[in-house]
């Protein structure tokens, strides 16, 4: 039987870096893909350069790969994700990749938000690709919330969506789950993954400001339209799948320490 080789797209991102670390610890040969200049190889990690948007370099990057963990996403230009998906799937077929594990977001099918529609379309393309697949939806990563609050706090007041619940789940724990899924058999849509506690977005912002030593007023703002209604209806959380362990408070403690 040939050796399992995992390729990680979006390998320099918040989640991708964690996936690399977890795969390396598991002793699995891992290939890290970036569209920028490849980094020097680490023990157990080989860096490759390829561009999902154009398809350049994908055939070489996927050569010999058995499983792809797809973490790449263009949040600034989300429409680019769809041609990226098509290039990824075409190259994966040519390379004979046997399993694609995709990370998605809890609520993408419940909230009519433009970026979420793109995520749903990506899930559909994967499911109809003919390539064995697994799809995991997760709630919000603390590191991304930290970055978002950092941007919002540049203003005199911090505006957050009103009556909107969030459920931060540690990105490292999600990475562990993705590697576990990649080493298993394709499972289709698997149970969602949420953090251990649910919070109002305003409370998350206030606790972040306190932990960072920042003084700002937090102002909840009602988001109009169907997307806002979806946020207020709890579309971003998954109480029945609160399987995460590390809390938001524990994450903030590590940020204070640094």
Across the structure, where does each feature detected by a protein language model lie?
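Short-chain dehydrogenase/reductase
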Residues: 9, 82, 112-121, 164-172, ...
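NAD(P)H-binding glycine-rich loop region in Rossmannoid oxidoreductase-like domains
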Residues: 6-7, 11, 37-95, 105-111
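Glycine-/Pro-rich loop/turn segments that contact NAD(P) or position catalytic residues
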Residues: 74-153
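Short, polar loop motifs at secondary-structure junctions
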Residues: 32-39, 223-226
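Residues at the starts of beta-strands that form the adenosine-phosphate
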Residues: 4-5, 29, 98-99, 132, ...
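N-terminal Rossmann NAD(P)H-binding glycine-rich loop of SDR-like oxidoreductase domains
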Residues: 2-28
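A conserved pocket-lining segment of Rossmann-fold NAD(P)-dependent short-chain dehydrogenase/reductase
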Residues: 147-169, 173, 185
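Mid/C-terminal beta-alpha module of Rossmann-like enzyme folds, strongest
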Residues: 2-4, 13-14, 172-258
